[in-house]
């Protein structure tokens, strides 16, 4: 309590479950401090209740943040949140994954999906915190290692650190070499290659080359795509390749 009173705290981000107690305590001691809630967009029961000013139950929820995968918000929780919380925002699955990856890399901290939602809100500018002293309450590190592996990959994709490219090639010698040289010149790392020339719907003289790359950021991905296009290669989506 004494620390809360003495510190120049500006904003607190919190997920739904504990926010009622946290908000009550903070507002009782420092009513000027802003308190924000964060929910997964696929399980936004309290977000809807807060903004629609009515208590409601979702038909279904869809999020890997199972700690906040709640269809019906608690009645007492809703009453306290309505009184003490300033706003509630939502974050996507990709944003949560990026937050988990950021916590691992920058803070050496393993957070579960629900615990990382406040960090996701901060990273993706969901609320006005620039220039303010802000606290994100990261509550929970209970995440399955198999899920964690997928989350890390998703976070890399979202942050431009990993990308899948599908290229339509003429099936003749030298094409793969040209593509490899362009990627090498751009400084990306190839971690996966799949060469598909056997689909019955594909032109006899053509093939699809699917590459999985490790990259620095979105700017490097664009550089690679632009150079491949300038060299005469056609980039297609995964969905397009799957249809051929």
Question: Predicted segments — roles?
Answer:
Residues 54-67:
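N-terminal glycine-rich dinucleotide-binding loop that anchors FAD/FMN and/or NAD(P) in oxidoreductases
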Residues 51-57, 107-109, 154, 209-211:
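Short, hinge-like loop/turn segments at secondary-structure boundaries
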Residues 74-132:
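Active-site-adjacent helical/loop segments in soluble small-molecule enzymes
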Residues 1-13:
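Single conserved hydrophobic/aromatic residue that forms the stacking wall/gate
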Residues 29-42:
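Short, acidic/small-residue loops that bind anionic groups at enzyme active sites
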Residues 145-244:
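A conserved regulatory-domain signal marking ACT and ACT-like small-molecule sensing domains
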Residues 14-23, 43-47, 114-122, 137, ...:
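Short glycine/serine/threonine-rich phosphate/pyrophosphate-binding segments
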């Amino acid at each position: 309590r004494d620390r809360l009173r003495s510190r120049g705290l500006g904003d607190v981000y919190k997920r739904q479950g504990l926010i009622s107690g946290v908000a009550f305590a903070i507002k009782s001691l420092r009513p000027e401090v802003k308190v924000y809630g964060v929910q997964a967009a696929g399980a936004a029961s309290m977000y809807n209740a807060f903004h629609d000013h009515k208590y409601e139950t979702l038909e279904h929820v869809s999020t890997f943040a199972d700690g906040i995968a709640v269809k019906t918000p608690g009645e007492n929780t809703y009453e306290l949140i309505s009184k003490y919380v300033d706003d509630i925002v939502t974050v996507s699955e990709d944003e949560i994954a990026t937050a988990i990856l950021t916590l691992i890399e920058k803070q050496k901290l393993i957070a579960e999906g629900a615990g990382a939602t406040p960090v996701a809100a901060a990273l993706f500018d969901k609320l006005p915190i620039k220039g303010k002293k802000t606290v994100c309450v990261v509550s929970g590190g209970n995440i399955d290692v198999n899920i964690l592996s997928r989350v890390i990959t998703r976070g890399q994709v979202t942050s431009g650190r990993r990308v899948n490219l599908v290229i339509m090639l003429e099936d003749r010698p030298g094409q793969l070499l040209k593509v490899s040289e362009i990627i090498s010149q751009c400084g990306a790392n190839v971690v996966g290659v799949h060469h598909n020339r056997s689909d019955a719907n594909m032109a006899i003289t053509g093939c699809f080359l699917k590459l999985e790359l490790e990259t620095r950021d979105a700017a490097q991905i664009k550089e690679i795509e632009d150079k491949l296009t300038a060299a005469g290669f056609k980039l297609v989506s995964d969905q397009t390749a799957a249809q051929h």
